[in-house]
Amino acid sequence: MSNQKKRNFQIEAFKHRVVVDPKYADKTWQILERAIHQIYNQDASGLSFEELYRNAYNMVLHKFGEKLYTGFIATMTSHLKEKSKLIEAAQGGSFLEELNKKWNEHNKALEMIRDILMYMDRTYIESTKKTHVHPMGLNLWRDNVVHFTKIHTRLLNTLLDLVQKERIGEVIDRGLMRNVIKMFMDLGESVYQEDFEKPFLDASSEFYKVESQEFIESCDCGDYLKKSEKRLTEEIERVAHYLDAKSEEKITSVVEKEMIANHMQRLVHMENSGLVNMLLNDKYEDLGRMYNLFRRVTNGLVTVRDVMTSHLREMGKQLVTDPEKSKDPVEFVQRLLDERDKYDKIINTAFGNDKTFQNALNSSFEYFINLNARSPEFISLFVDDKLRKGLKGITDVDVEVILDKVMMLFRYLQEKDVFEKYYKQHLAKRLLSGKTVSDDAERSLIVKLKTECGYQFTSKLEGMFTDMKTSEDTMRGFYGSHPELSEGPTLIVQVLTTGSWPTQPAVPCNLPAEVSVLCEKFRSYYLGTHTGRRLSWQTNMGTADIKAIFGKGQKHELNVSTFQMCVLMLFNNSDRLSYKEIEQATEIPAADLKRCLQSLACVKGKNVIKKEPMSKDIGEEDLFVVNDKFTSKFYKVKIGTVVAQKETEPEKQETRQRVEEDRKPQIEAAIVRIMKSRKILDHNNIIAEVTKQLQPRFLANPTEIKKRIESLIERDFLERDSTDRKLYRYLA
């Protein structure tokens, strides 16, 4: 079969042409034209759309697509010109209604016509790249109605007038507005933008420019912001009701520019109502409104932040440099915490916990807290007050809150080592006097300090707690080996490691014989059980509980310092003693003795002895007797030593000197670490790196760094470069 010849088939063309009636196109078009008229005249109920579709189909099939297309355009144009005259003739409020009515009729007619001309749409128009029926119908409406001279301007003015009326409080037909403006959108984005949106935005800009000027002259800041917020809300609602969604960003930008951006500086600085007034008076609602409005404009929040920062720094500067407000350290710190709480609440409540404002708050507090050189001391005194008495009766959760607030202030300190120095002194007094209200709170704060600054910062503080525990064990051993002492006075000794505790010179004091004997027995016991140790008594740091019987047999237990005990025990053998006799018998230094006597004789309710003559100050000619008339409703009476809560100027200078001495080895260690790593480094870079490395503890003075470099050169840790004197080399 494969060998058979292939047969070729040929299809011949028709020998006779198909003849089309020369008047076919005109006749068919006339049928379609009449149908279009009937559709526009809303008289289409008797039409056969199947027949009309077939007629249009055949015209295209017989190459009369162009005639059909141009005829459709001409007929629709004619109808629209007539409709535009009817719309133009409408008066007053009926103008938009007539326009909307004719627009709806046109759309309905256009849908029917498009269905009839569907074949032309799919073939002829597609192949010739002409505009399809439906968009052409929209274009014709645009050109013959919307852009008709006598309608165009009137339409725009009517719409803008209605928007204006709505803005001043009149009620308008939003449904009609929505339909008419949707017409613009249906006609194309460019039509909506050019014929309505752009003029609308221009008119809105002018409206809000005038209104904002009226408001700024007549309203305070809070009211102005309320009106601005209301206008923004209204414009957003307006978009939702009858504008294109894309217009929201544009119209809100207009309101933001005219109402907020153009008046930012005047608003924040408005006298008696601006930002500072809001901050001072905790106007959270107004502050929140300002934040939400200003965040919408360029540099809005920067403006708010800068004004807040300026106010905070000025307020804080006054707070920490006012001598009156620095008299009480506890109140001083509490004011700082109150201000911090106040602005934390403002930032959380009104500013959405914005990190920009948190950072501004932190930088401001760091700035002004360090303006007062006594801030480290005062913060430590605040802690001391809380841990002595201020935490009684509050929950563990509240204790942690207070300690966290203290740590927050601590982080702001540039001289954390100064705080450490004071904190160690105050902790020592609390531990030795047994006056801390909570060991857990003490240890919790040390853990927080350790987390913040590292082990080195807290190692000595932890050593103090270790000594207290070791001392308890030592005392049990002492009394266990001396059972005969159980009947006499009880001695409790805390053995303190010199390196862990604040060093104080031993103050001379003649202890009463009963106590002195016990002390010697303890010394013998301790040195006998520990080799290579040395004990020195710190009597100025001790306390005593002594029982006293006054004139009419009143019995009290007096909690006193060791010095006060030494003075009071003298009155067991004498009814009357002079200042000189007490001084000679006790050998207590004059300044300490005067404070001691002042506490015993001059404090109301604690005056267990009387002085002659009566006065608040202690003189060297004074005489002292037991106050037989002393009474107290308490059996146990604590007699504190009259002492300034904060350091005196000489004490402050002494502490500062100790701090500076302690810094020297730390600076040298930092220099050596850096040079060991870098080998060669110039002077400026050493200063910068040492400052950065020591910043967590203190702000190193460049002059002191230079001195430490010189000291290290003298001791052959470093050497200067022979050619460049500002270059240093590390010597291994």
Swiss-Prot record:
SMART domains membership: CULLIN, Cullin_Nedd8
Keywords: Isopeptide bond, Ubl conjugation, Ubl conjugation pathway
PROSITE patterns: CULLIN_2
PTM comment, free text: Neddylated. Deneddylated via its interaction with the COP9 signalosome (CSN) complex.
Any single GO BP term: response to red or far red light
Sequence position, cross-link Glycyl lysine isopeptide (Lys-Gly) (interchain with G-Cter in NEDD8): 676
GO molecular function: ubiquitin protein ligase binding
Listed SUPFAM superfamilies: Cullin homology domain (SSF75632), Cullin repeat-like (SSF74788), Winged helix' DNA-binding domain (SSF46785)
UniProt cross-references to InterPro entries, sorted A to Z: Cullin, Cullin_homology, Cullin_homology_sf, Cullin_N, Cullin_neddylation_domain, Cullin_repeat-like_dom_sf, WH-like_DNA-bd_sf, WH_DNA-bd_sf
Disruption phenotype: No visible phenotype under normal growth condition. Reduced sensitivity of the inhibition of hypocotyl growth in far-red light. Cul3a and cul3b double mutant is embryonic lethal.
Pfam families to which the protein is assigned, alphabetical: Cullin, Cullin_Nedd8
Domain Cullin neddylation: 662-724
Domain of life of the native organism: Eukaryota
Family stated for the protein in its record: Belongs to the cullin family.
Subunit structure: Interacts with CSN2 and RBX1A. Interacts with BTB/POZ domain-containing proteins BPM1, BPM2, BPM3, BPM6, BT1, BT2, BT3, BT5, AT1G01640, AT1G21780 and AT5G48510. Interacts with SR1IP1. Interacts with NPR3 and NPR4. Binds to NPR1; this interaction requires NPR3 and NPR4.
Biological role: Component of the cullin-RING ubiquitin ligases (CRL), or CUL3-RBX1-BTB protein E3 ligase complexes which mediate the ubiquitination and subsequent proteasomal degradation of target proteins. The functional specificity of the CRL complex depends on the BTB domain-containing protein as the substrate recognition component. Involved in embryo pattern formation and endosperm development. Required for the normal division and organization of the root stem cells and columella root cap cells. Regulates primary root growth by an unknown pathway, but in an ethylene-dependent manner.
Protein name: Cullin-3A
Gene: CUL3A
